[in-house]
Amino acid sequence: MIEFGNFYQLIAKNHLSHWLETLPAQIAAWQREQQHGLFKQWSNAVEFLPEITPWRLDLLHSVTAESETPLSEGQLKRIDTLLRNLMPWRKGPFSLYGVDIDTEWRSDWKWDRVLPHLSDLTGRTILDVGCGSGYHLWRMIGAGAHLAVGIDPTQLFLCQFEAVRKLLGNDQRAHLLPLGIEQLPALKAFDTVFSMGVLYHRRSPLEHLWQLKDQLVNEGELVLETLVVDGDENTVLVPGDRYAQMRNVYFIPSAPALKKWLEKCGFVDVRIADVCVTTTEEQRRTEWMVTESLADFLDPNDRSKTVEGYPAPQRAVLIARKP
């Protein structure tokens, strides 16, 4: 059974305590009414994993846990089997005592692009919106964050996160809540807020930017990573039924247009930190994610286009400050 009591106890003692006015009731309602049909199967996989405290833990350069003496073949097989019960694994990679989870996305590459542009994370309280399996939460802790909180309504991601946490010695510096950003009150409590790979899924992208702003303390930093297209500050792609086979893609602005949106929402010191094309080396099918991936979503005769004829995915990182 996945519980949230440790998180409630933690925030009761800090500047997030006002969240307790709404959060426990929301989680209780989720537990009663909204659990996925496979949630019990997934949470059982977490429950059956052994609790291991790493002898060596590296969250600075990767998410890697090692034991002082190698685990037995039987222990490794048990861990491997239980983690495979939580497939597909999309965000990673993770190296856990000799079990290497080769995820669909090389999320470490994204982190390497983002990290040099961030304010120092040491001692910060961080929110990661749409955090997936929580890979970047652990990297934030590795970079010195005091507390990293992720929100993502996808329940498989919650179970993947809790599985990794259990294998990292039940580390309580990072937490994942099965909520969407629209369920959060205006907490105004986080030093840094990340939204990576979310904006293009929002029907109202400016509303999403306002929601992110409402979570930041004054002088807090927003890190926004999303799909973009080439163009000037007035360029926005509005795809038809699908974009790269995804149905729920609504608006893909140019990076200059996105900068303008952020300024319109009251952010300052907005800068475009990075723009890069997504490659089939960064997003691909693996034995831990066996269905279609980026290579299947691109035009086989022109890899600069999606199968629908739109520009192939490229992603930008923008950094902004809430005054």
From Swiss-Prot:
Keyword tRNA processing annotated: yes
This enzyme's EC code(s): 2.5.1.-
Catalytic reaction equation(s): carboxy-S-adenosyl-L-methionine + 5-hydroxyuridine(34) in tRNA = 5-carboxymethoxyuridine(34) in tRNA + S-adenosyl-L-homocysteine + H(+)
Gene3D superfamilies in the cross-refs: Vaccinia Virus protein VP39
Key words of the record: Transferase, tRNA processing
BP GO terms, sorted: tRNA wobble uridine modification
Molecular function as annotated in GO: methyltransferase activity; transferase activity, transferring alkyl or aryl (other than methyl) groups
Amino acids binding carboxy-S-adenosyl-L-methionine: K91, W105, K110, G130, D152, P153, T154, I181, E182, M196, Y200, R315
Subunit note: Homotetramer.
Function, in words: Catalyzes carboxymethyl transfer from carboxy-S-adenosyl-L-methionine (Cx-SAM) to 5-hydroxyuridine (ho5U) to form 5-carboxymethoxyuridine (cmo5U) at position 34 in tRNAs.
Protein name: tRNA U34 carboxymethyltransferase
Organism: Salmonella typhi
